């Protein structure tokens, strides 16, 4: 049984090592994170009636951008606990998470376990044209390359703010403010 784990680990580690060696210096063309300095997630127009009530939104995508300080700490902490426990400690890519995912996938002979950090997910979400949702090695390599660049360019709080305003939360709702309004009829700060 132990032999199976060793073989599985080698079968996964060798191709990953080769891919890093081959694609690391050259690799796919990845977007430039410097352009995100002025980035604002797209928001749907909001139309109000004469009495001040919001007219129902007909847009397929709803988003309301909020500042980091408007998002309750319990929500920020909860997201980090679920999505990326070591967010405050790593430099964009969580090597322990990568090793954990490789080990679990190798020992189960499946690809169920992921290792995307919040910066990696943010890269995928803000560059949908360059990093399509379909799983591919080139997309993952770009995410791995972009995450440390995001960490160099932005403070952790800025990354979390961008992520929480960008993330899709179901029912056409993007970002935590739109989700709070859509699901609970309240602002995220409430």
Regions found by a protein language model. Name each.
Residues 1-47, 86, 106:
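N-terminal type II signal-anchor transmembrane helix
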């Amino acid at each position: 049984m132990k032999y199976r784990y060793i073989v599985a680990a080698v079968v996964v580690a060798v191709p990953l090592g080769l891919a890093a060696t081959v694609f690391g210096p050259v690799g796919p063309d990845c977007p430039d994170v410097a352009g995100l300095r002025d980035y604002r997630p797209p928001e749907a127009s909001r139309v109000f009636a004469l009495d001040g009530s919001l007219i129902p939104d007909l847009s397929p995508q709803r988003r309301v951008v909020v500042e980091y300080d408007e998002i309750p700490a319990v929500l920020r902490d909860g997201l980090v606990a679920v999505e990326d426990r070591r967010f405050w400690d790593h430099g964009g890519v969580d090597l322990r998470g990568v090793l954990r995912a490789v080990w679990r996938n190798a020992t189960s002979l499946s690809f169920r376990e992921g290792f995307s950090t919040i910066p990696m997910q943010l890269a995928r979400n803000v560059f949908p044209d360059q990093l399509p949702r379909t799983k591919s090695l080139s997309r993952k390599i770009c995410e791995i390359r972009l995450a440390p660049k995001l960490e160099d360019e932005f403070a952790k709080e800025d990354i979390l703010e961008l992520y929480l305003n960008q993330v899709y939360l179901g029912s056409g709702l993007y970002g935590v403010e739109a989700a709070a309004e859509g699901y609970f009829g309240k602002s995220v700060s409430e």
